[in-house]
Each structure stands twice: as C-alpha cells, then as structure tokens.
Amino acid sequence: MPQTTPYSSKFNPSAYSSSHSHRQPVEENYGGLHYRDNKLVSGSLEALIQLLVPTVDYYPDRSYIFTFLLSSRLFLNPFELMSRVCYLGVDHHRVGDPQMDKKRIRDIAPKIVQLLTEWTETFPYDFRDERMMRSLKEMTHRLAFGDELSRRAMQRLIQRLLRKLTTLGQYEESLATTSAAAAIDRPVALKSKQQLVRRDDCVLNLCDDPFIFAQQLTHIEMERLSYIGPEEFVRAFAQKRPSDNHKSFFSKRKASNLEAYVEWFNRLSYLTATEICMPVKKKHRARVLEFFIDVAQECFNIGNFNSLMAIITGMNMNPVSRLKKTWGKVNTDKFDILVHQMDPSSNFYSYRTALRGATQRSSTAHTSQEMIVIPFFSLFIKDIYFLNEGCANRLSNGHINFEKFWELAKQVSEFLSWRQVICPFERDRKTLQYLISAPVFSEDELQLASYESEGPENNLERDTRRSLRSSLSRM
C-alpha cells in the first residue's frame, strides 16, 4: 500500500508543489482509498477510519492521525469515531477463544494505547464529552484483559487527561470572572473622565517601559493561544453551515477559547484608544501615543504580531486618528513603518513576509525568546475560512476530499508549534492585571472623549458631540 501521508515526520509544504516534469500522475485505488503519486488524496469515510486503526503489524503515520482526527468531526461525532476505533481495534477480531483473544489483545494493546495517547494529548477537549471519557475507561478494562502494562499505561493516560481538563476548566472560570469584573468596573459615562485620568493604575504610572509592557502583552497572548484546541478551527467554520449533520454537537459546546482570544484582540484595541484619549492635556496624550508606538515596535521585534495589529487598530480608530494636534507633537516615522508592515494590500504581503521571517527564526532559535511567533490571528482564521470555502469536503463520487484536509492540517499544525512555546519573560503581575481588567471606553465614549480633547471641526462633529453628551449623560 502507498504511504498514508504526503509528509514523513512533519507537514512539508513541498509535498504540494507541482512537479517540474510533464508526466501523468500515477493514480491508484486501494480498498476505498485513492492515491495520486503515492499520496492519499481521497477516500470513503469507512476506509479512512480503518486506516486510522492500528493492527498488530501496522501503525498509522502520525500526520495522518492528526489530519483525520482534526477533519473527521465534520462527518461524524468524535464519540462515534471512538466507538468505531474500539470496535475495529479490539472487538472486531475476537474469535471467542479466551486464550487467543487474550493473546491478540496483548499484541495490539501497545498500539491502541499509543493511538489514544495521541488523541488525548492533541485533542483533549473531545473528552469533555462524558461518553468519550466513558469509552476511554471501558477501553482500559478491555486492554486489561490481555496486558497489565497497557492497563497501567491507560490509567496514566487518563490521569494526565483529567489534569489537562481540570486546568482548562480553571482557565475558563478565570476568564469568565475577569470579564465580569471588567464589566462591573467599566466607566459608564464620560463625566468621570477627570477622575479616571488621575487613577493610580493609569498605564504610564503603572509601567513606562515599552519592552516590559510588550512582554506582558506576550504573556497574555501566549497563555490564551495555549488553550485553543485545534478542533476549534474546524468547529468555527462548521457552525457556518446550517446543513451540517452534526450541528447539534458543535452547538452544545461553551463559547470557545478561540472566540475569547478574538475578544482579547478587540479589548487591546479599545484599551489602546482609551489610554490615548483619556488625558486632558495634549502633552500627556502625546506621551501615551509615543509609548504605544514604542510598545508596538517591541511587539514586532518579539514576533507578537497579534498585539502589534491590535495596537495599530486602536490608533487608527477615528477617535484617535482625528487628534491632529496630539499627533503633531509625535514623530510618526516609526509608526508609519509599522503600519506598512501590517498593510492589508496585496493580501498582507509585507506582514506575511515578516511572519515567514519570524517562523524561520523560530525554527533555528537558540533562545526561547527567538522561538516566539504570535500570528495576526484574525488573518490566520480568515486563511482557514477561505481554504474551507474554496474546496468541497466531498468529491462527486462521495469520497472525502483529503487533499483539502492535508492543507488544513498543515496550517493548524503550524499553529500548534507556535502555541507550545513557553513565554520566557518575567511576569509583572500589576501590569498583567491592568491589561486584562482595566476599564475601557465604549465606542461612543471614545468619540466623545476625543471631541472633549480636541474640539469639533465642523457642524456635523458639533452635532455629534452634542448628541453623545446627551445620550451618555442619561446612562
């Protein structure tokens, strides 16, 4: 049988490059699987499931395991897949002779344990489903019938999994608590602006070192990235298809960590704009503006493109961009370069070039700081979305389009390599707490703060300010 995957030990983009020769590709079929030039390109769901299941003399390629576990949830619930794996891996081959069954289980058990280890370590959130956990425990009992070592390995596997799920639950509770506290403490009207300017936790009073501030942003980014499960990328676009047969499964899940990460980007943008618009005096606003430009530069140097883009987005919001007198006191050369780096023209060509450079640096890194790559996340999601929209999940013959899912897995696996890096910077707890919980202005409050800082320039702006004052004073 041809190799199961176009990659050996990792996902290799060259597997998708076109050949320089003009020969016809070699097409082959094996039991419901279709190969082109020795690469799996499509197959029936049942054949792909069977390819996942180890036998005594076969174990699937790791990149195939990842790709199929990632994409299969578009076609069947993970619990259904687990049931099929249990049946095909153990129950299907029982012959009714206790001794022969015990020997076979003993022979296959290490590979079943290995497969379940990869599943629980890469997709632990699948096992928040009680049925999945129950199946895992049942498999432990089945393997114990033939092999004590495998039973112990399964017990250790379950213990590691439970620790991961406990940590996830604590993280989600912490996010919910922080969000609730920020909502309660949030200023509800601009009449409190003067008091907020003088608050002790004003950003420059708290931390006036752009490098340290960028480090703390990187801590938050990397922590939130680390909790995003790879399956969330599939779930994100699966929910957009009303005809999906497993919509009910996807909709049962809580708000995803992916969504929480996108919300963090929005929060940082609004926090940046709030801090710039808040000071009453022009020179103070200019200092804050310069500070955030320097923070953005440090984020770029670190490889934290998500915080960089969030800060630029905040600075480009109308309440900030219209402060011409404030901008006039700032040297914008550095800012202009950063804006160019994140310019959306030519499909973010400049940013993608910088990202490739950061990725290359990470692959040859000598220090943990050089390993950091935090992509502009909204664009990363957009790329996956267009990959999904541009290719069908199934071919006309009913086969699953596995070429599409190789490409999806390649993109998501790169994300996983970025996600696993440990942030090397020292934590500044006060700055971290400020970043995640400091009150921020709403869009209307920002606009009014901007008008109060630098007055309206025309009748339309004067009318807008009057309307905002009236509406916010009633809150």
Swiss-Prot record:
SUPFAM superfamilies per record: Ras GEF
All copies of domain Ras-GEF, residue ranges: 209-456
Keyword ATP-binding: no
Annotated GO MF terms: guanyl-nucleotide exchange factor activity
Cellular component GO terms held in the UniProt record: plasma membrane
Record key words, sorted: Guanine-nucleotide releasing factor
Stretches with biased composition (Polar residues): 1-19
Residue intervals of the N-terminal Ras-GEF domain: 36-166
Highest taxon in the source lineage: Eukaryota
GO biological process, one term: Ras protein signal transduction
Pfam family for this entry, one: RasGEF_N
Region (Disordered) residue spans: 1-25, 452-475
InterPro entries: Ras-like_GEF, Ras-like_Gua-exchang_fac_N, Ras_G-nucl-exch_fac_CS, Ras_GEF_dom_sf, RASGEF_cat_dom, RASGEF_cat_dom_sf
Function statement: Guanine nucleotide exchange factor (GEF) for Ras family proteins.
Protein name from the UniProt record: Ras-GEF domain-containing family member 1B-B
Organism: Danio rerio (Zebrafish)
